[in-house]
Amino acid sequence: MGLIKLKVNTNSQQYSIIIGNNILKKVNKFLKENSIDFNQCLLVIDKNIPKNLVKDTLKSLPKGSVSIHYFNASEKNKNLKSVNEITSILLKKSFNRNDCLISIGGGITGDVSGFAASTFKRGLKFVNIPTTLLSQVDSSIGGKTGVNTKYGKNLIGSFYQPSLVISDTNFLNSLPKREVVCGYGEILKHSLINGKKFFYFLNKNGKKIIQLKSPFIQTAIHQSCLIKKKVVEADEKELGIRKILNFGHTFAHAFEATLRYSAKLNHGEAVILGVKTAARFSLLNKILNKKEFELIDGHLNDLNLPRDINKFFSIKNLNTIISFMRKDKKNNTKKISLVLLKRIGSPVYKLQFNEKTINLFLKKELTK
């Protein structure tokens, strides 16, 4: 497949998403085409990315204008301290609002860099070059930035749209399979909230996508971006329909926080568990029918993806999981807000449940 270009139109910003293979040598060309100019540029690069994969970007940018900050990307480093390190560099080097910050890394790097860009002098040009499957299909699009705290995930942040997103699928070949599965969690989520066609494509081709086979991986990325773009354009600040993008995430964020963001469960795996848990909760509350639940569960089983929360948690974790769900940013009453499924491709988001209902449900799931 050739170069794919999408245009995202939100109230605050219009920007392009460029998807292709081995396109980093054209970064400066893409910047010029999108009227992104600057005197200085700070690259925030995930230190875990092989250096040979970013050398084309460095060669492409104007000499003398670039500073580099290597960031040790992890959920534990997704915090205000890391944001402060970036903004301190910008201040020391006398950056101004006409300059640019470019993130090269996965979702964590993009979230931290984007938040730093949004707060520096109330807004610095921000270009996102996502390097993981998860960030290419989800977190790089839509303007959500932020950091974790001891009270929960992404509780401090901002909506700040990038000026440009450049997704080079060549990065994906360097990922361990577990990181590819991590991204597949968000692809699966998108397929369940927007019609049935994409889910059936995944159900048929999921193994090829996880194996990064062409053209299946490119199609999955393209379709995920189209779904995310459509939702973000309709509701930039998550006041309504954008909440459907949180399908599975209320459970997922609580699972991650309960494990203190340990390597036992990465974000995408938590999302897959959260999707399964939300689908089962939908079934048991007579919102989703059994046939469609079994289609979803069967798909997870066929791909050997995480399905059962009792393999990661025990009953002793129940109160902690509930406490993090209580702190979820989508809640605006004493009840817990959940995005559930009516059918594959048809989510419902204006649903609230008392803690007792969720407690009883999780208790049964944890003691199976």
From Swiss-Prot:
Pathway: Metabolic intermediate biosynthesis; chorismate biosynthesis; chorismate from D-erythrose 4-phosphate and phosphoenolpyruvate: step 2/7. Binds 1 divalent metal cation per subunit. Can use either Co(2+) or Zn(2+). Zn(2+) binds at residues 186, 249, 267. Its EC number is 4.2.3.4. The keyword Cytoplasm applies. It catalyses: 7-phospho-2-dehydro-3-deoxy-D-arabino-heptonate = 3-dehydroquinate + phosphate. It is an enzyme of class 4 (lyase). Pfam families: DHQ_synthase, DHQS_C. Its main location: cytoplasm. Catalyzes the conversion of 3-deoxy-D-arabino-heptulosonate 7-phosphate (DAHP) to dehydroquinate (DHQ). This is 3-dehydroquinate synthase.
